[in-house]
Amino acid sequence: MKKVLVINSSVSQLNNSDSLAMSNMFIEEYKKMNPNDEIINLDLNETKMSQKTLTRNNIAEYFNQEDSFDFIEQLKSVDKIVLNFSMVNWGIPAILKNYIDHITIANLTFTYKGSTDGNAIGLLSNIQDVQILATKGGTGTPNSAFTEYVKNIWEFLGAKVKSEIIINEMMDIPPYAEQSPIENLEKVKEQILKAAKNF
């Protein structure tokens, strides 16, 4: 039995989130293939930690048991991650950045000890795959920089990102702007179902 951590970092309302709809479809299909796996849900909108931004005024107490170490222990206990988010001002949501800052800690999730080439050694090698599900605006906005950043972070921490990144785009222009998240899934439905079966 595998443990799958599903991280929701969409800042849209639950009934209006395209990236959350992607995640829900993915997990629904995944559970059909893996009914005995444990699914753990983490909504960053509902955690105190993800509301805290690192500053010079709070750095002394920023990394603590409740906000950092408990979440790191969770990461070390799971086998796979499904992460959904949308592009916000050409970047990732602040709650996801705050989460990343809280769990990226030397000698806990990465280390330089034992490195022979000066590169960090990731300590989250237990994570066999990270599935990234993202949404963005029209084709005029950058397509991959925001997802590549997230991919690079997980790989830096030792996790494997074997699954293809799935991006559902053009959510803010007609006809997609008038459609429900479920309707907007049609463009990437086959990608999602295939990825879930191979995850």
From Swiss-Prot:
Membership in a protein family: Belongs to the azoreductase type 1 family.
Gene3D superfamilies xref list: 3.40.50.360
Superkingdom per UniProt: Bacteria
Name of protein: FMN-dependent NADH:quinone oxidoreductase 2
Gene designation per UniProt: azoR2
Molecular-function GO term, any one: FMN binding
Binding residue positions for FMN: 10, 17-19, 135-138
NCBIfam families: PRK01355.1 (NF002370)
Tagged with keyword GTP-binding: no
Stored InterPro entries: Flavodoxin_fold, Flavoprotein-like_sf, FMN-dep_NADH:Q_OxRdtase_AzoR1, NADH:quinone_OxRdtase_FMN_depd
Top-level EC class as recorded in UniProt: oxidoreductase
Cofactor list: FMN
Subunit annotation: Homodimer.
Its biological purpose: Quinone reductase that provides resistance to thiol-specific stress caused by electrophilic quinones.
Pfam families: Flavodoxin_2 (PF02525)
Reaction(s) catalysed by this chain's protein: 2 a quinone + NADH + H(+) = 2 a 1,4-benzosemiquinone + NAD(+); N,N-dimethyl-1,4-phenylenediamine + anthranilate + 2 NAD(+) = 2-(4-dimethylaminophenyl)diazenylbenzoate + 2 NADH + 2 H(+)
Keywords: Flavoprotein, FMN, NAD, Oxidoreductase
Cofactor descriptive note: Binds 1 FMN per subunit.
EC numbers on record: 1.6.5.-, 1.7.1.17
